């Protein structure tokens, strides 16, 4: 269920000798908390979860997952891919016990090519791109000031109208689903109205 932006780096790490555990999902696209608990070991470095699936809109229970991770191994970092959720689903990094969160500007009508990485305060991560000391030494290279400003405005607009947007999309989605499901041999994939924004049918 992971987006290639997360899945492919994990495959790369496997090629470099890291052990990656891949978990399956149930018929609605949810990862079993029990299966996840069994997969976390004393040497588990990172758990990564897509909060909202980019094809079905299925929502993973990020708060329950975060709680589980920290109970099983407080040293395991928790990354959440929030690209499809940001501005469309409430996110509380403290409540969800998130250490790292990523999002992309173009998914909230911001500029293309700009995104955000949230890092829990005090967390030290070795930079991937070396050079200057931009972004507090976490990523070298001159910042795209206009892109960052555009992302800030887009985020402000998204969060200001998020509650109303969620309710409006639910109404439109229900009308669409009712119409399509009235046709023979159709079914909803995923969680239906519980999913974010998307309607995925066959």
Where are the language model's segments positioned?
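Pyridoxal 5′-phosphate
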Residues: 1-201
